[in-house]
Amino acid sequence: MKKIKWILILGLLPLLMPVLVILILASAMAGGSIGGNSSVQKGVTYSEHWSNGDAYTHNLLVHRYGIKASQLDGFLKTLGINYDSSRINGEKLLEWEAKSNLDIRAILAIALNESSLGTAGVATNPGANMFGYGAFDSNPENANNFNDEVAVVALTQQTIIGNKNQTFKIQDDKAKKLASGTLNTTVDGGVSFTDTSGSGKRRAETMQKLDTYIDENGGTPKAPKQTAGKTRDGGGITSSDIPEGYSLT
């Protein structure tokens, strides 16, 4: 009888897999709602500006479509920081966004507020990262074990998704709960930072400044609408890959 039960369970696995995948994706996006103006392309969710009305409550796994490296470089130069442009620049930020699935505006905001774009604190050590990943209050030098690229991917998977920190507001709220002794890490997940002075709010303000700069310097096209069943002949692009207002000719 037990053998028959196992055969039945194994036979049902292929049918259950799609449901499990949907549940996993839904869990990853939990903690920050996504507005009705969102679009999904190749597994990446886009919103015109913010997923939930403003940068502070924005889901950090939702992106603004079509941001250019030149726009990012232009914004970085307005900050008045003598940063290493070979270490952080528009092209690298775009690469980090693609590898981590973290909103590029959040990546820049975290780097700025954690280490002034890698120019302050432990981030100046050889091999350390500019995002504060691994820099525990009790052992900040631990950040030396994670370079920038490794850190931004791990930060997204562990800190943002695994510990349910999908918005900067959630991160601020959890830091306050930790300080007051009311944080239930089993339910709420761990904190992104322990500072209670409004670190999340400041990061959101940086995101908003970058978003405004982009608007004032060329803007971005609207994300392509989600399509079902499209095909690619010979690996080329299709008309559904082209942003609104653009064409293949």
Predicted regions: what they are:
Residues 111-115:
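His-Asp-centered metal-binding catalytic motifs of divalent-metal-dependent phosphohydrolases/nucleases
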